[in-house]
């Protein structure tokens, strides 16, 4: 293998922003944030969904609208879809 062409494969902390669950795994992801975990500094990758918050794994159903997309859609279209479907 050629030297210097492969990304840095290192330990990274992935943190689920909706449940504050985090785990350490190896990845080549480029991050700007860092976090101290177990007395060691790691790069931090923030994710919106993990096995701790995904409805398939938790068995619960919840609306995960972190960007306000559902509310924006409802303001724009209101109940027009409900009337058209009848």
UniProtKB/Swiss-Prot annotation:
Name this protein carries in UniProt: Large ribosomal subunit protein bL31B
GO BP annotations, alphabetical order: translation
HAMAP family: Ribosomal_bL31_2
GO molecular function: structural constituent of ribosome
Subunit structure: Part of the 50S ribosomal subunit.
NCBIfam families registered for this protein in UniProt: L31, PRK01678.1
Keyword Ribonucleoprotein listed: yes
GO cellular component, one term: ribosome
Gene that this polypeptide is encoded by: rpmE2
Keyword flag tRNA processing: no
Keywords: Ribonucleoprotein, Ribosomal protein
InterPro entries xref list: Ribosomal_bL28/bL31-like_sf (IPR034704), Ribosomal_bL31 (IPR002150), Ribosomal_bL31_B (IPR027493), Ribosomal_bL31_sf (IPR042105)
Protein family (similarity comment): Belongs to the bacterial ribosomal protein bL31 family. Type B subfamily.
